[in-house]
Amino acid sequence: MSHQFSPEEQAVLRIVQANLPDSLTPYADLAEQAGMTEAQVLELLGRLKASGAIRRFGASIKHQKTGWTHNAMVAWKVTPDQVDDCGRKAAEHSHISHVYYRPSSAPDWPYEMYTMIHGRSEAECLGVVEDVKRTTSLKEHAILRSLKELKKTSMTYFT
């Protein structure tokens, strides 16, 4: 079900999709930019969250500056009957931020479930891989390491 965003909603989302104002009163500053009151902005954001039109509202932290310097995308060989249970168990791990199921159409690529693992060292990431293997029926996997970050931005939905 899609949500038709009003001009007022779009105005607020256009501002918050970039960055919140760096001040002691970010919502008041945001309201001023949008031509609204702070109460109106808070009500609008609360309504959008409650309706499911926005999933979450929070800070993006530069993980490298907090010591989380390693990550690994792990591709797992999974059967269709394993996906829900194994995906749920993997998602419970605190070092895993994303779990996706993507059916493969490539005959030489048997991996269909992907987890994004974060750690403070390569050994910590590898330990998470072992934890997933121990707590699920998943065994066969491929670890895809990033060689270079080419782009990392948040999506812009309203311009």
From Swiss-Prot:
Any single GO BP term:
heme biosynthetic process
Q: Which organism is it from?
A: Desulfovibrio desulfuricans (strain ATCC 27774 / DSM 6949 / MB)
What EC number(s) does the entry state?
4.1.1.111
Family classification: Belongs to the Ahb/Nir family.
Which cysteines form disulfides?
Answer: none
Q: Which residues form the signal peptide?
A: none
Q: Which Gene3D superfamilies match?
A: 3.30.70.3460
Per UniProt, the keywords (alphabetical) are: Heme biosynthesis, Lyase
Q: In which pathway does it act?
A: Porphyrin-containing compound metabolism; protoheme biosynthesis
Instruction: Write out the GO MF terms.
Output: lyase activity
Q: What is this protein called?
A: Siroheme decarboxylase beta subunit
Subunit structure comment from the entry: Forms a heterodimer composed of AhbA and AhbB.
Q: Which domain of life is it from?
A: Bacteria
Query: What does it do?
Result: Involved in siroheme-dependent heme b biosynthesis. Catalyzes the decarboxylation of siroheme into didecarboxysiroheme. Siroheme is decarboxylated to monodecarboxysiroheme, which is in turn decarboxylated to didecarboxysiroheme.
Q: Where does substrate bind?
A: 152-157
